[in-house]
Amino acid sequence: MLAGAAACQTAPPGTSAAAGPRVVLEEAEAWRSVASERDAVALDGLAERWRQALAAGRAANLSRRIAGEGELLDPEARLARGAPAPGSYRCRYVRPGGRKWVSSAPGFCYVGVEEGQLTLATELRGLRFGGYLWELKGGERLIFLGGAVPAGSRTPPAYGDNPSRDAAGLVERIGEFRYRLTLPEPAPGAGLTVVELVAAPRD
């Protein structure tokens, strides 16, 4: 089951962080010693990616769709206590920057804990991955670093083992028991995938 996939990973290996003055996500954080330069640059440029994606969507006459998502597609929406509690979540994703509206069917995500660090795994058609969450200073946001699950497999590669399958994003709380994971595409100028996570009712 993918719900436990993130917990099956070995701790991701350290790689060199991006150098230079391009720091948007606060001062140096622990995640930078793990993230690739490519992913650090993409995360540092997330505000501009949001601007470009929303502008492209509105230019494609998708303003009503964007507005209908409320806080999910409001890059300024962020609440304190950003870390999601361990457990199951209903989730789906949208991609706001294309010529056509892209929204996935609902699926499930799972937040766990391994050796004191939060893990996240998704089970969505076309978006299956698992990895670790790194809390930023202040506690309002977390960095996700993980890997996409290969076809025919149940477990994602550890972050850094296969750079072509690496995934990096930003987690924020946007409502009661509601979170957002924003995944910038690694290529410069590419779009965004925004995953909504809503805590599933407990039986």
Where do the model's predicted regions map?
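C-terminal motif of bacterial Sec signal peptides marking the signal peptidase cleavage site
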Residues: 4-7
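Amphipathic/hydrophobic helical signal segments and adjacent flexible N-terminal regions
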Residues: 9-84
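Edge beta-strand at a domain terminus
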Residues: 64-71, 159-203
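A short, polar/proline- and glycine-enriched secondary-structure boundary/capping micro-motif
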Residues: 128-135, 153-158, 190-196
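Classic N-terminal secretory signal peptides
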Residues: 137-143, 170, 175
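An anionic, turn-rich surface loop/hairpin at beta-sheet edges
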Residues: 98-107, 144-170
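Short, solvent-exposed aromatic-acidic interface loops
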Residues: 123-130, 147-152, 183-190
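Mid-length scaffold segments of soluble, non-membrane domains
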Residues: 80-142
